[in-house]
């Protein structure tokens, strides 16, 4: 599994790969701080099975190139949309490009029910697998739990599952949150645009590149300064003014 750099991404994506008894291979990021297609292709080996583009901090990866590389090497694509729910790439929603796509509704995501998440796919087999895995694999056999000793639904595909079922209460909250998503995204985009216009003439600030600015969720404003100490000093000054800011994963050292 190929995954964007740990120093600018999150452990959860790698942990999911390890939980599947696979080995995550870390790819570098480009100046958007999302997966670098050039390094992605350089890291592919005969053992590579899938690529996980992480739409980090609300902006889309370069999906044209990611999908092209995946098709060339016959790889599955698993989008990590945890921080970019509601974002898009060239007019198409993030989370609709991959073979499977993962969303998070944890408490500091764009919309939340406190915890929980969602998997989307347009592949019937993958849907059935996900449904079974999250529900102790009981529904994997025809007839569900009542016929747990029936033959396998798909030949040669019996496996243990876990309990990742979302409660009805959290599901109801999330349905209400989904109706608010467009309004939340719109407000964040307007706020980000105002800030960008306000700092456009400040020397030394280089805004992060965004592969499709129209699809940016607006959840964060990321820019580069000359060095790490200056970035930390800058963040401290912003915090003193009541503006939440930090350098990315302070002192984080990838293994």
Language-model features: where?
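PLP-dependent aminotransferase-like
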Residues: 1-84, 88
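Structural detector of well-ordered beta-strand residues that form the stable sheet scaffold
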Residues: 1, 25, 77-78, 102, ...
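Conserved PLP-binding catalytic core of the aspartate aminotransferase-like
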Residues: 208-255
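Conserved donor-binding loops in enzymes that form glycosidic bonds
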Residues: 56, 178, 223-227
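Basic phosphate/pyrophosphate-binding loop/patch that engages nucleotide-derived ligands
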Residues: 67-76, 113, 118-139, 229, ...
